[in-house]
Design a protein with these regions (language model features):
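A surface-exposed, glycine/aromatic-enriched loop/edge motif typical of exported proteins
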Residues: 109-143, 234-283, 332
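Short, small/polar-rich motifs associated with maturation and membrane association
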Residues: 1-214, 226-228, 284-285
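Outer-membrane beta-barrel proteins, especially TonB-dependent receptors
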Residues: 138, 143-145, 152, 209-212, ...
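Outer-membrane beta-barrel transmembrane strands
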Residues: 167-184, 193, 232, 287-332
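Short loop/turn motifs enriched for small/polar and acidic residues
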Residues: 37, 104, 232-236, 330-332
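Composition- and surface-driven signal marking solvent-exposed, interaction-prone regions
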Residues: 115, 203-206, 230-231, 243-244, ...
Length: 332
């Protein structure tokens, strides 16, 4: 499997007629949408027969994934009008205990990013716009300014806001340890998972961590009755700057002017996150410093901790005299 933080992304490009769309690249906030055959609504997702969010499952716990469309999904009723995704988690098998460990280090990179002009290019373009809109007397920058920025004279170095804000790659660590086994009467599967996903920002202040564990136990009471217990726990930790929407950072970056340095002379990041940008015509844009927005030490902190526990117990009864007929019930 391709290492992913969100299991919903496993379906991308793998199943005919199934489309996925990741609405955000923010660690822990991918919010991937699944659509089957262009339906406008999400399909019904059943994990071991229980309706739940596909993204809440560790990919290492998945045994199989099936996608049902049209008539094949009709058995699940009105809820299956947009298709069905069936996910089965791993279970124990008879035999000696089997211990498995997997570890992945993934470097995520941006597929495309717009190039920004340099300080000297920006000054030349603003001066050209001024001369076209007004006249030479009202030009924001003089010819001397253009020369100074081109030669990077002290005080005219400018700054590369893209490089100061964003790194070329973001690492993601994944670890999973599982133990399975059993005998004729009792079978078990237990797993422990950990994910640490960093963001593209130099501040590394949009981190996401996840701890998860799962235990599936099957007990054979007699030749006709089987009892099972499925337990899972997951903890999601999201650490972000306070009240920062990702879209705001990109908007601020698009208006950040390269004539201004990204740090002060003592190499301290620009301390005031509320300073407005000034357009070439002299009006303020009202946007903030994108680097400050991405830094918890400047913009404050917003931490979110989610704990999710799920449990399912039930039994299956083989009806005597009718081959293959099984009755069952479960509580979750």
């Amino acid at each position: 499997l391709v290492p992913v933080a969100n299991s919903s992304n496993l379906l991308a490009g793998r199943v005919p007629g199934v489309m996925t769309r990741q609405n955000s690249g923010l660690p822990g906030g991918e919010n991937t949408q699944i659509r089957i055959r262009s339906f406008s609504e999400a399909p019904l997702v059943l994990v071991d027969g229980v309706q739940m969010d596909f993204s809440r499952i560790d990919q290492n716990d998945i045994e199989s994934i099936s996608v049902l469309k049209d008539a094949s999904a009709a058995v699940y009723g009105a809820r299956a009008g947009n298709g069905v995704v069936l996910v089965t988690t791993k279970r124990g098998q008879s035999g000696k205990p089997k211990i498995s460990y997997s570890s992945n280090l993934t470097l995520q990179s941006a597929t495309a990013f717009l190039d920004h002009v340099s300080a000297s290019q920006y000054v030349e373009l603003v001066r050209e716009a001024n001369l076209n809109d007004f006249n030479d007397a009202n030009a924001t920058f003089t010819e001397l300014d253009v020369e100074n920025y081109s030669n990077k004279i002290q005080g005219y170095e400018g700054g590369n806001w893209v490089d100061a804000l964003i790194k070329n790659n973001a690492p993601m660590h994944q670890h999973n340890l599982s133990v399975s086994g059993g005998n004729e009467n009792v079978k078990y599967f237990t797993s422990f998972g950990y994910v640490d996903q960093e963001s593209f920002f130099n501040s590394r202040d949009f981190d996401y961590r996840r701890y998860n564990t799962r235990s599936n136990i099957d007990i054979k009471i007699n030749e006709r009755i089987n009892f099972f217990v499925d337990l899972s726990y997951r903890q999601d930790i999201r650490e972000r700057p306070s009240k920062t929407a990702l879209s705001n950072i990109w908007i601020d970056l698009s208006t950040a002017q390269p004539i201004y340095p990204t740090t002060l002379s003592n190499n301290i990041k620009v301390p005031d996150p509320s300073v407005s940008s000034v357009s070439y015509s002299g009006s303020t844009t009202g946007n903030r410093n994108p680097i400050a927005r991405s830094d918890r030490s400047i913009f404050g902190t917003y931490d979110r901790l989610d704990n999710t526990f799920r449990g399912k117990i039930g039994f299956k009864y083989k009806v005597p005299g009718v081959d293959g007929l099984t009755l069952g019930t479960d509580i979750n």
